[in-house]
């Protein structure tokens, strides 16, 4: 039985940085690799195509937000929206 290509775990990005497309892409790729998942396997587990996962991990524009959320939830990445202060105008 031959082993497939081993996935090299990438470090977790600085999650205290302001939210950006690049940060989300880095976080998804880091979590996937830390779980030892190749792109094909992760895409299958997340219910998206490998092409979509690659686009998201590379920070490509034009991907559906629903796909990003599906991947984040499947990989256990939490997205939190904090309450904001209301302006009294």
Where are these regions (language model features)?
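N-terminal flexible/basic segments that precede or flank functional cores
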Residues: 1-23, 86-89
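Short amphipathic helical patch at the helix-1/turn junction of helix-turn-helix
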Residues: 22, 32-33
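Residue-level signal for the short linker/turn that defines the boundary of a DNA-recognition helix
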Residues: 26, 35-38, 63
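Short alpha-helical DNA-recognition segment
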Residues: 36-54
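DNA major-groove recognition helix of helix-turn-helix/homeodomain DNA-binding modules
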Residues: 66-82
